[in-house]
Amino acid sequence: MIVDTNALSAAADDDPAVIAVLTRAGQMAIPVIVLGEYRYGIAQSRHCATYENWLTALLRDCAVLDINKPTTQHYAEITLDLRRKGKPIPTNDLWIAALCRQHSLPLLSRDRHFDQVTGLKRLGW
């Protein structure tokens, strides 16, 4: 399962619903984009050290998904499809969606705009 920034934040705050979903999923992957967004949030937090320590521990046990050439093809297809539908989504989320499609993994996110992406399964909590 791939996690979006809002799911990662909820997990860091011990949201029981998110923890339950992640426990059932077994493996978790974090897109490099999500890692950047989350670290930006940490930098603004009063609890910076606590969240950075939590993230460091988490990263020992989960994959970080990088963007590569195949990702760019998925990105282009998704962006074009959503533009044609008149339903654009934020650029970072396009990259996250592209990684989900590339790796055939569902996305844990509260952002319903991911539901517009053909071939992507979004899980909420």
Where are the language model's segments positioned?
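Histidine- and aromatic-rich ligand-binding microenvironments
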Residues: 3-4, 31, 88-90, 111
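Active-site neighborhoods of divalent-metal-dependent phosphate/nucleic-acid chemistry enzymes
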Residues: 63-108
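Generic structural signal for small/hydrophobic residues in well-ordered secondary structure
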Residues: 4-5, 38, 75, 100
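Acidic, PIN/NYN-like endoribonuclease modules and their adjacent C-terminal/linker elements
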Residues: 97, 101-125
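Short, well-structured N-terminal submotif of metal-dependent ribonuclease cores
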Residues: 1-30, 41-59
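A general structural signal for well-ordered alpha-helical segments in protein cores
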Residues: 35, 48, 52-55, 72-75, ...
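A generic structural signal for short hydrophobic patches within well-formed alpha-helices
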Residues: 8, 35-38, 72, 114
